[in-house]
């Protein structure tokens, strides 16, 4: 990884993990409002057995563990052992004894039928290889009438994305995302997430779109570095940027983000989709 602000980013896995550790406090602060929104939407109760899919570095699993109490339990599941270790460290720091991690694929869950009272995923379901299969597999491990609750990104056309990745796209053209690759906006179209939940056998399906706070507690330089570090779906586009264009892109990103900044924090706002269904 290079630290020069006008250089092309290094897209190695280690770089992303270093960035996750470097920005963990501020990233958690930025994501707190969407975590809170999903937790409130899910309505966890004391004693519940909860499964959080694509849990990454630990949210909303850690917040859910605080809500279900000592007689409840939360399992944080993800493909990345490294991110789950970050989640486990965060849970230990909070002395949560009702929290465990599980490295596994959401398409093949290592749990018996009827294991969980509640399932959640924050910004994860968009990246399932086969959402229908994953949702059916999740339904298998839910108990009768248990609820699955998801939060996904709304459209690309919103300040957080347009002010940074939109600037890059205007420079390089071509596809914003790699065809067939990970798509953060897979369920941005109204009704698309609820439709696939119904197809997977869920009942009482609901969906709504909300605009929530999405605020970075620091300067433009930080949020731009953090965005590049975690922007895996945009990597093919970012790799098309010629080396000599990066200084101009950095300048234009700063100009695009500045209207949302008060000098201490950057208030983008986030358009998200909340959806749920019952077994």
What are these regions (language model features)?
Residues 2-48, 59-63, 67, 86, ...:
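Conserved class I S-adenosyl-L-methionine
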Residues 117-131, 154:
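A short SAM/SAH-binding and catalytic strip from SAM-dependent methyltransferases
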Residues 49-109, 133:
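Class I SAM-dependent methyltransferase SAM/SAH-binding core
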Residues 107-118:
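A short acidic, Gly/Pro-enriched loop at the edge of an enzyme's catalytic core
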Residues 3-4, 8-15, 30, 57-59, ...:
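Conserved Class I S-adenosyl-L-methionine
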Residues 132-133, 139, 143, 147-218:
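Conserved catalytic/acceptor-binding region of the Class I
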Residues 68, 91, 168, 197, ...:
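Conserved hydrophobic residues forming the short capping helix/wall of the S-adenosyl-L-methionine
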């Amino acid at each position: 990884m290079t630290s020069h602000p006008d250089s092309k980013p290094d897209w190695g896995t280690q770089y992303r993990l270093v960035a996750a550790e470097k920005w963990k406090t501020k990233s958690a602060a930025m994501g707190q409002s969407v975590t809170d929104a999903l937790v409130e939407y899910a309505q966890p109760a004391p004693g519940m057995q909860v499964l959080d899919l694509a849990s990454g570095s630990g949210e909303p699993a850690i917040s859910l563990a605080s809500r279900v109490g000592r007689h409840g339990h939360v399992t944080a599941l993800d493909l990345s052992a490294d991110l789950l270790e970050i989640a486990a460290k965060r849970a230990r720091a909070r002395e949560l004894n009702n929290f465990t991690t599980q490295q596994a694929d959401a398409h093949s869950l290592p749990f018996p039928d009827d294991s969980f009272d509640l399932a959640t995923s924050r910004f994860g379901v968009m990246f399932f290889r086969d959402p229908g299969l994953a949702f059916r597999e999740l339904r298998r491990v839910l108990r009768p009438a248990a609820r699955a609750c998801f939060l996904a990104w709304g459209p690309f056309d919103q300040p957080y994305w347009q002010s940074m990745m939109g600037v890059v796209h205007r420079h390089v053209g071509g596809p914003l995302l790699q065809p067939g690759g990970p798509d953060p906006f897979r369920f941005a179209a109204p009704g698309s997430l609820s439709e696939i939940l119904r197809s997977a056998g869920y009942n009482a399906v609901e969906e709504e779109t909300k605009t929530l706070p999405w605020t970075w507690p620091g300067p433009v330089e930080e949020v731009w570095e953090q965005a590049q570090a975690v922007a895996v779906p945009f990597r093919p586009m970012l790799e098309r940027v010629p080396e000599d264009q990066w200084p101009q892109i950095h300048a234009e990103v700063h100009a695009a983000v500045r209207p949302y900044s008060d000098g201490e924090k950057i208030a983008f706002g986030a358009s998200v989709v909340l959806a749920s269904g019952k077994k």
